[in-house]
Structures are given as C-alpha cells and as structure tokens.
Amino acid sequence: MYLEKEQLPYFNEWAECFCQYLPDFSIRVTSRAEGSHHKIKIRLHFKGQSHFFHVVQDLNQMVNEQRHKHKNKSAANSARVPANAVYIVKLSQIDQHWFLQPPRAKGLLFEQDDDLFWPLDPRVIKLKGRPRGATTKSVLRTPKRRRVIRKKVTDITEEEEVVEAPQSSGSLNAATMRLFQQVLHQEMTPMQAQVQALQDRIDSSVVNISDNKKKVEEEGLRSFDDEFFSPKHVQAVQLSYGTRSHTPAATQRRGQGRGCG
C-alpha cells in the first residue's frame, strides 16, 4: 500500500534518477544482477565439475573478493577531494527524494520552469529481454532480416551481346572537338618531325642491292684482265706431232744411224 501511494505516482522521476546518477561501475546497460550472474556462470564453468562443497566455497570467495573491491573503491573515492571543492558533500547527506523539492534561488520561485532542473541529454537505457506480462501485439517487433538463399547454377546460359551504337560526332560539342584537334596536332607535330628525320637517315644509308652487285662483278672482271694481260703480237703455234725433229742432237743421231748401215 505504501509503495502504491508514495512511490508509484513518481515512478518516472525516481527511476530516471536511479538510472542516471547511481554508480554502477561503468555498467550502464547491463544490470547488477545480470553482471553477477555472468561472473557466477564463469566460475561454475571452471569449478562446476568438482564437489558441491568446493563449489560453494569458491562462490563464497568470489563474493568476498567483490565486496572488498567495492569497499576499497568507495573509500578511495571518498578520500579524493577536488581542488576547487569548498567542502565535501557525502552521499548520506543528500536526501533520497531531493527531486521532489529541487533547489531554488532565494526569494525566487520557478514554478513554471521546472523543466530546467531535469538532466540535460539523458542516457538512453536499452531494455533487455521481454517485459513481464507483455503480449505479442503490445511489443514492437523489429522486422526479421530476410534470408537470401543462393542456388548453385549448373546450366550454362548464353548471354546476348549488347552492342551500343557509336555516338555520332555531331552530338559532341564543337568547342570540345576543336580543343581535341588542337591538342592532337600539338602532340603529333614533334612525332612527325622525328619520323621524317629517321626516314631521311634510312634513305641516305640504304644502297640498291642490284646495282651494287653489278658494280662488284665489273670490278672483278677488270682485276682479272689486269692480272692475265693478252700479248700484243701473237705467234702461231705449229704442231710437231708425226714429223721429224730438226734439232742438232736429232740430226746427229740420224747421221750415225746411216753410217752404221
């Protein structure tokens, strides 16, 4: 009855204050119960196969370690004093229902400016799981992601080749065409000059092969005539086959033969 009369009418105020300002050790979305359950599950994953008594001892040790850790951290935070602090304000000195009577300036009332005292840029608390007592129609369901099933293609399909018609020159801009022609002329002029110079060098160095061959043959014949020159007065050669020799030795041999006979 007390909760229904005193707390539920101001549920939005104290719930938002609880979510915004109470420390949760940097865990803003996951609740403390979910965090503790996660740690217990990790412990049971490694110690769950042992005896139940040892499991309870291990969980008791884990809880004591967390309690000492939180106690030491709160003590260190209470001892940390900002440099610009006038005096230290403890959490126990602040009324739990301070938002019901927000601080006012002296002599002024801000009855119509209550929105100024609400926290600026509040954090968005994301709910986890399904709310208790909710039905399918009352809960907004996000659309499911469509699953795409890709089938393996086994048949080879012939694709039609699409040939685009060439764009006519008349459709181009005249200024663009002139600019293109100027750039092309500037690039082609030095290349044409280099090609002409190379062609002149080739023409000057190349000799006709047929003319060169004739000249070589004529020079060879001339050299042959110079080495084997013909005499100016040619004497007739008489054949002496079947005739008597008129040399002195031959005449003497014939005379000796006659004397012996």
From Swiss-Prot:
Region: Disordered; residue ranges are 242-261
Q: Where is the composition biased (Polar residues)?
A: 242-254
Q: In which domain of life is the source organism classified?
A: Eukaryota
> Which pathway?
Secondary metabolite biosynthesis
Record's function text: Part of the gene cluster that mediates the biosynthesis of squalestatin S1 (SQS1, also known as zaragozic acid A), a heavily oxidized fungal polyketide that offers potent cholesterol lowering activity by targeting squalene synthase (SS). SQS1 is composed of a 2,8-dioxobicyclic[3.2.1]octane-3,4,5-tricarboxyclic acid core that is connected to two lipophilic polyketide arms.
- What this protein is called in its record is Zaragozic acid A biosynthesis cluster protein 8
The scientific name of the source species is Cochliobolus lunatus
